[in-house]
């Protein structure tokens, strides 16, 4: 901005001193004429020339990095539990990514989900064995945070995927989709499935402390505050710990305890499959519907017969691939894990860059909706 300078002209009045001669009978003294005061030289006021200074941009555009990896060493994958079709599909993507970016992946996790502390020994073992990176889906965000922090202190790159821990305990969190969007989708599926968006609904979740499921359920509850969902009544939230037998038992209990139940919403692929099997076996198709997050191959038959009118999920293989690529980028030093960094992972996201956002999070993309119109094609195209 240019400064405006005001000019002031300096005016100086010159006063002439006149000597008067006085007549007197006494001798008149001789008075030397007064010397006129000199006229001061006033320097002209000069308006300075102000050169505008270009404003620096708020932030310099960071270079977009294409991750190449080329790493060696061990990368340990720690899902919530083993034998889970969802994480098995993710591990397919991880193995595929290892051929592109280097490193040797392996899985180590509890046999059963639901225990907040069960992952800690696996994190500690990977740290002791000097793994280059660990990929963790948190069963409990708080319980494992100290073990993750200790791993970072030993130089292990910590990548969370699917379910997050506490900020500061990891390098990057690879989130499968926007949390608010998933919650909104669950609420909308319940509304679409319940008769005229009215009636009793219940939630069958994974573990009570599961970070991602709890966040989605909270987002669903927030969405349902809208008057559009006023006719829906949430009567229960139960937990199957992502174990088929536990989830089946919980679905049976829900139906027995709530004879007017219209929809079971399950934000877990294990739970949604178990609930669909229970509804089908009890011949309640058309009376109790099941919606939630499910894999296309497992849910195809239940979508086609009307047990589960629609479910949604992201490409779990791509989720695993992206998580491993991020780990490789951190190990190689191609990315640092700072907010604002942009990078490209070849073969996914259409070549568009991912940007690290708040809490060091990146998002895989939008979920896929599976229904009668598209389930056959998705089940054919997607190997999970």
What are these regions, as identified by a protein language model?
Residues 4, 23-384:
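A residue-level marker of the well-folded mature domains of exported/periplasmic proteins
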Residues 18-21:
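C-terminal motif of bacterial Sec signal peptides marking the signal peptidase cleavage site
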